[in-house]
Amino acid sequence: MLRRPAPALAPAARLLLAGLLCGGGVWAARVNKHKPWLEPTYHGIVTENDNTVLLDPPLIALDKDAPLRFAESFEVTVTKEGEICGFKIHGQNVPFDAVVVDKSTGEGVIRSKEKLDCELQKDYSFTIQAYDCGKGPDGTNVKKSHKATVHIQVNDVNEYAPVFKEKSYKATVIEGKQYDSILRVEAVDADCSPQFSQICSYEIITPDVPFTVDKDGYIKNTEKLNYGKEHQYKLTVTAYDCGKKRATEDVLVKISIKPTCTPGWQGWNNRIEYEPGTGALAVFPNIHLETCDEPVASVQATVELETSHIGKGCDRDTYSEKSLHRLCGAAAGTAELLPSPSGSLNWTMGLPTDNGHDSDQVFEFNGTQAVRIPDGVVSVSPKEPFTISVWMRHGPFGRKKETILCSSDKTDMNRHHYSLYVHGCRLIFLFRQDPSEEKKYRPAEFHWKLNQVCDEEWHHYVLNVEFPSVTLYVDGTSHEPFSVTEDYPLHPSKIETQLVVGACWQEFSGVENDNETEPVTVASAGGDLHMTQFFRGNLAGLTLRSGKLADKKVIDCLYTCKEGLDLQVLEDSGRGVQIQAHPSQLVLTLEGEDLGELDKAMQHISYLNSRQFPTPGIRRLKITSTIKCFNEATCISVPPVDGYVMVLQPEEPKISLSGVHHFARAASEFESSEGVFLFPELRIISTITREVEPEGDGAEDPTVQESLVSEEIVHDLDTCEVTVEGEELNHEQESLEVDMARLQQKGIEVSSSELGMTFTGVDTMASYEEVLHLLRYRNWHARSLLDRKFKLICSELNGRYISNEFKVEVNVIHTANPMEHANHMAAQPQFVHPEHRSFVDLSGHNLANPHPFAVVPSTATVVIVVCVSFLVFMIILGVFRIRAAHRRTMRDQDTGKENEMDWDDSALTITVNPMETYEDQHSSEEEEEEEEEEESEDGEEEDDITSAESESSEEEEGEQGDPQNATRQQQLEWDDSTLSY
């Protein structure tokens, strides 16, 4: 049977069928069964000022469920399987977010949520997961990828500049040395990266300095440094990091140059000025010992004050030797054999002495000079103890005997009774005993061998002789004789002795009697006398006291200096330091192990001069040191220190004497037992003149000058000398007297001569005032005396400071005898000598403390009354004539009136007192001054009579040629037939 074929389908139907078949297959394939996939590790970089992280590899999540490419255009809005919807970061405090950029491709980025700071945290690590969008429109069954690790590094930005660790740097280098590194400057950078946090270079900004700095900050010198050229360098240094950023603040570097380290004392001044009267002055206030870091076991330092050129070895009071003995407590009776030349003590007048009065009197003996001590100055008995004291400076002049003091026969035998002499470097004392019943050997010569005798330095020698014992003190230290020679006593004789200083006295006999020097002839009435064994050197303060030995306390007082070194160590300093002081106070020795404590002790050493008026000049200072080290092989040595103390010139006092210069006394007072006090109102003061700087800003103003201020001070006096001017004192009729009991209480001695009286001894100005107030002048023949003049001079420190010359003139008032003839007014005074001055100078005299009988004589009183009455009468007469002349109209009337006014003066007798005439002559200047004052006060009265006086004067001029007037003048002449002058 035949079948029929099926009919063909339309094209539209075919397309619909294919779509249905295909659509059913795709839907069947959209199942979300795969997880997204990420790389296991990511590395990222982010910059501080950016928020996007650059990852390697890029952040892309893959999903196998991704739709087909050709179907994407139909299903993009309805299909989610295979797309990536997000990323999730796991970790605490992770400042990053992961954001999907393209869901279909799974691309994403990581961004920072906040500003990153590399300095706080340089890198971060965390995990991240990707998740897809799930399936279906609701996004169910979301798949997550595995956790991938992300490492992010924060890149640095050069935001911080280098900063130096120190605000400044200091270093000390020794001159002349080349250093590889002196010091290191170091800067830091707060940036976190190696590029920006590292310092790549340093630079010295200061130009032209001999230093350089490397990249690590080490500074070194480019040449050897010189302390003399520059003590310190100041450098400015900057730093750069590796990003070429410069430090905002540069740093200052101070490099001090230290002299080449030499062990020694440092911090002392070469010159120290000492102001008199300021007490102790520290001489090394900042001294310290530099040991250059060498280990030292102990240090011994000796400080010495050199004063050998001042006075007799140092500064001492420069009073006379007798006054010094008294001040030191020595008993009275000291005889000064080499006194300062004065009126009564003049045997040293021809000896050369030192210049000036800053030091006491020093006598020079050149081998040809000597002085004989006058008889009666001192006597020595061999049976009594005695003391010889002397300052001596002697050099090594040879082997000849040189005599200091010698007592020998005046004539004939040339025997030496006692003698102190030098022989080489030996001091020898010869003391021969007087004749005695026992003729046996006895000690006669005592020998001392001393370096002090010939070292050309001043030394103090005291010889205490109490036979047979003789003790010698040199500078306060006792010395026993190394040899004693015995001899027989002297033979009996009645020959007088002669005491000589600087040689020995002997009569020339042709044989030199054990003398090794050529004798020098001295002219004498007794024959050819000679000096021998002359001394060459300097002597001062030679004294001899008989009857008592010198105490050790007195000897030390005489030798002790008024200046020296002092060390006052505080309780908290100077521990462990041993201190030794020399008795002379000129040497101090310090020893210790602790250098710090030794330095403190040295800083407290001071110079002190206790004199009110010290001797100005230089006192040299010297420090010598001895170092003991643990290792003697490398022990250091310390050079000596040389400096000086400059004692400034003290303000010189001006001693002023004031009082009554002129006065008169009756002759009876001069002849009385009390006499007349010469200085009843004497005043002694002393002043110094100081410069006072202006106050405020006056020192800056050149127009303001310093003012001088005079201040009164108090000090002692040692001499007051009263001398008579004109003829010397005649002790047979006049004398100067003083209360000796008061003098002994004051400790002031007095000596008198024909020239006057001298008071000596150290005492206050008030004491000298009191003593001089009691000085009296007596004259037993005052009726033949008109006046006497005296001069007073006081001084201090043996003539260093001298007062003004205070002169006093005393006049004698002579009183007439009332028992003479009644007409004594006309008699010639008996006390006026015609060959002498006929007047007594009373001008300017003050009648101090007048007595009832010291008045004008009665004769003179009558004469004065008569003269004054006559003068008043003549004045009244003159005034009357002037007024009458003014009223005259005719010459006849005038003549008549003149005749009426004539008076009979034939019986008038006038006696003139010579004393009054002399007073009038010398007081004319004072009267003229008084008249001028009266004329100025009475000017109006004078004006009233001026015209009358002028008319009267014209008329008187016209009357000069009138014979009648001549007759009248003859009538008015004085009757001086009985006038006495």
Swiss-Prot record:
Where in this protein does the record put region Disordered? 915-981
Q: Which PROSITE patterns match?
A: CADHERIN_2
Which residue intervals are topologically Cytoplasmic?
Answer: 881-981
Kindly list the GO CC terms recorded for this protein: cell surface; endoplasmic reticulum membrane; extracellular region; glutamatergic synapse; Golgi membrane; neuron projection; nucleus; postsynaptic density
| Positions glycosylated per UniProt | 346, 366, 515
Q: Where on the tree of life does the source sit, at the highest rank?
A: Eukaryota
- GO biological process terms on file: cell adhesion; homophilic cell adhesion via plasma membrane adhesion molecules; neurotransmitter receptor transport to postsynaptic membrane; positive regulation of synapse assembly; positive regulation of synaptic transmission; regulation of cell growth; regulation of synapse maturation; vesicle-mediated transport in synapse
Location of the Cadherin domain:
38-164, 165-265
Where is the chain membrane-spanning? 860-880
Q: Give tissue specificity per the record.
A: Expressed in the brain and, a lower level, in the heart, skeletal muscle, kidney and placenta. Accumulates in dystrophic neurites around the amyloid core of Alzheimer disease senile plaques (at protein level).
Acidic residues bias spans: 925-960
First and last residue of the signal peptide? 1-28
Question: How is the protein modified post-translationally, according to the record?
Answer: Proteolytically processed under normal cellular conditions. A primary zeta-cleavage generates a large extracellular (soluble) N-terminal domain (sAlc) and a short C-terminal transmembrane fragment (CTF1). A secondary cleavage catalyzed by presenilin gamma-secretase within the transmembrane domain releases the beta-Alc-alpha chain in the extracellular milieu and produces an intracellular fragment (AlcICD). This processing is strongly suppressed in the tripartite complex formed with APBA2 and APP, which seems to prevent the association with PSEN1.
Intervals, Extracellular compartment: 29-859
**GO MF term set:** amyloid-beta binding; calcium ion binding; kinesin binding; X11-like protein binding
Keyword field: Calcium, Cell adhesion, Cell membrane, Cell projection, Endoplasmic reticulum, Glycoprotein, Golgi apparatus, Membrane, Nucleus, Postsynaptic cell membrane, Repeat, Signal, Synapse, Transmembrane, Transmembrane helix
Protein's cellular compartments: Postsynaptic cell membrane; Endoplasmic reticulum membrane; Golgi apparatus membrane; Cell projection, Neuron projection
Membrane-topology descriptor: Single-pass type I membrane protein
Biased composition, class Polar residues, residue ranges: 962-981
| Annotated effect of mutating residue 918 to A | No effect on APBA2-binding
Please give the positions of the paired cysteines in each disulfide bond: none
Described purpose of this protein according to its UniProt entry: Postsynaptic adhesion molecule that binds to presynaptic neurexins to mediate both excitatory and inhibitory synapse formation. Promotes synapse development by acting as a cell adhesion molecule at the postsynaptic membrane, which associates with neurexin-alpha at the presynaptic membrane. Also functions as a cargo in axonal anterograde transport by acting as a molecular adapter that promotes KLC1 association with vesicles.
Domain characteristics, as noted in the entry: The cytoplasmic domain binds synaptic Ca(2+).
Spell out the protein name for this chain: Calsyntenin-1
Origin species, per record, is Homo sapiens
